[in-house]
Swiss-Prot record:
InterPro entries with a match to the protein in the record: Ig-like_dom (IPR007110), Ig-like_dom_sf (IPR036179), Ig-like_fold (IPR013783), Ig_sub (IPR003599), Ig_sub2 (IPR003598), PSI (IPR016201), Semap_dom (IPR001627), Semap_dom_sf (IPR036352)
SUPFAM superfamilies referenced in this protein's UniProt entry, alphabetically: Immunoglobulin (SSF48726), Plexin repeat (SSF103575), Sema domain (SSF101912)
Record-level GO BP terms: axon extension involved in axon guidance; axon guidance; branchiomotor neuron axon guidance; facial nerve structural organization; negative chemotaxis; negative regulation of axon extension involved in axon guidance; nerve development; neural crest cell migration
Classification via CDD domains: Ig_Sema3, Sema_3F
Name recorded for this polypeptide: Semaphorin-3F
Function in brief: May play a role in cell motility and cell adhesion.
Main location: secreted
Organism: Homo sapiens
Amino acid sequence: MLVAGLLLWASLLTGAWPSFPTQDHLPATPRVRLSFKELKATGTAHFFNFLLNTTDYRILLKDEDHDRMYVGSKDYVLSLDLHDINREPLIIHWAASPQRIEECVLSGKDVNGECGNFVRLIQPWNRTHLYVCGTGAYNPMCTYVNRGRRAQATPWTQTQAVRGRGSRATDGALRPMPTAPRQDYIFYLEPERLESGKGKCPYDPKLDTASALINEELYAGVYIDFMGTDAAIFRTLGKQTAMRTDQYNSRWLNDPSFIHAELIPDSAERNDDKLYFFFRERSAEAPQSPAVYARIGRICLNDDGGHCCLVNKWSTFLKARLVCSVPGEDGIETHFDELQDVFVQQTQDVRNPVIYAVFTSSGSVFRGSAVCVYSMADIRMVFNGPFAHKEGPNYQWMPFSGKMPYPRPGTCPGGTFTPSMKSTKDYPDEVINFMRSHPLMYQAVYPLQRRPLVVRTGAPYRLTTIAVDQVDAADGRYEVLFLGTDRGTVQKVIVLPKDDQELEELMLEEVEVFKDPAPVKTMTISSKRQQLYVASAVGVTHLSLHRCQAYGAACADCCLARDPYCAWDGQACSRYTASSKRRSRRQDVRHGNPIRQCRGFNSNANKNAVESVQYGVAGSAAFLECQPRSPQATVKWLFQRDPGDRRREIRAEDRFLRTEQGLLLRALQLSDRGLYSCTATENNFKHVVTRVQLHVLGRDAVHAALFPPLSMSAPPPPGAGPPTPPYQELAQLLAQPEVGLIHQYCQGYWRHVPPSPREAPGAPRSPEPQDQKKPRNRRHHPPDT
């Protein structure tokens, strides 16, 4: 046991601790992984830590012109500073009335998760006001908020807001404080303008909505009834007629979940402008219905409905399937149909943005996620293609081959192709009737290259959100993907062309953005401020887009990371700026070649190798630790017995086991002593990570030092000090300077180990067994006893 304890102390002293992974290296392994504590230690992230009694945070609007971000949660509207979300946040407490909450509970809803005012819509009304809607405890309500820079509260109420109470609200609206005058620079809610939120905000907070406020008209994909069965795309407010999709028509919408809405112009003619909705729904055309399909739908902004048919209903609504699949060698595709999030990356041409979408697989047998990219050219080609039509003896879906009415269904009035028609009410009845029965396009929209950009299969998480940033590096422009997961982490990914057919995915980092893991709900990015803002049920976090110092202190580490944000400046890995005049900045994102980029700096790579000394006993085991900074590096172990010998590579044998953490040597032999070097190779760049000098001790020598014969040991003379511990005798026997470190560690170890009660100094001795006997109880005692 003492021999094993000596080996354990030596292993702890040199930092070696064996670990046995259960699986091989997985693809898409992050180069840097940071826990929430480690992320905070970098000073590049901040968590919104005001103690509000609320949950379900959603980032609903980013206003970079005013440096504000507007967040909705249960019973609160927050206005946060984009530079620092904890700096003077503006808070409005907007709760449902107690009577409404009581009615909600009586209807069978949960008092905490459903019977509250969950803010789900914040849209810019004009330069001074916001339009805000909440579920209102299953009674949707909307009003206007003055977007000021100061809170409508006295210092006392501001303190209460920080503690979680905020400004008092009555009957679902904020009561104005009499001490705070209503001025333009005050952030306050206008209760006198409270109105119904039906058709704007869902009743159920678990149902998502997608909305856009355009020209003071609100377009929203939403469920409009208490039971959550009537879904529609609505147009409310404004001067035009209120519009919606055809009610209870499964060909139009079939149990949809709305994800995103985006205005994308078709041409220079404003009458051609269309609003695109991204959603998923149960499909009627699937071979094995019901199945969930991802959809993209669109409507014309100047749609007024039909004259006799489709009155006050969209007469230009069309939809198509979004396909995100991995083609197999046998021609069978693996589909990801559950659309989760959409990010629209603007380009110099406002008519042709790039669409990024996150998908997950349906069902529980196959668990996976994917990111697909779509072009507007492909989307428009599908909407200009054939319509889906049911015909034939089997009543199956076919492309419509009959006579197409004029104007083509889905064309906007007064646009490029219909300049003489000023309204959809001027369309012939045959066009309106065709639209009612043929809203679906026959062809589907496929991603670029007809394959996903990023795929995750077999991972213990699913992707939930996406944000994309364009970064100018020394060798070109790159798109950096930030992917949120249902584990509360954010992954930073770039995808590079490997050859003509394949792409190479690099996960630069994965960080935990919340102290308590929770699925990422919403995420927005500010390229101007180089910040990412992430929201979940537990709070809001904003973090920098780059942490260059986390890649390492060497030029090779910085270059091998291939992060477009970072470059070697001659001293450290720091933020790359295209306008920098320093000639020593080294960056190579496309190839990551430190041999070419880091000339003059690579000599320091081997000097930074960790050197240590370990001891082992023949017949036992030893673990040599080696963890390269990059998980993509190839690790090799080299052995050199004596300084003049040639180094040879250690290959996997019965006695040698290579793990992700190092090298395990089993059944040590005296011939195993020597210098072990762990080298890491990545992109043809090789450097030494660690060197371990291993000393193998004979079992007989160790046993003789730890257990000397009794005849040789004489009783200590009077007045002598405490006897020398056996391990110290072993150190004196070996006469090696490194063994003094083991003695040092052992002394410190025994100093901190609490003594047992029997050996503790000053502890009362336990009584003898005869003293512990219970005395016999005599009934009659002498008086003087």
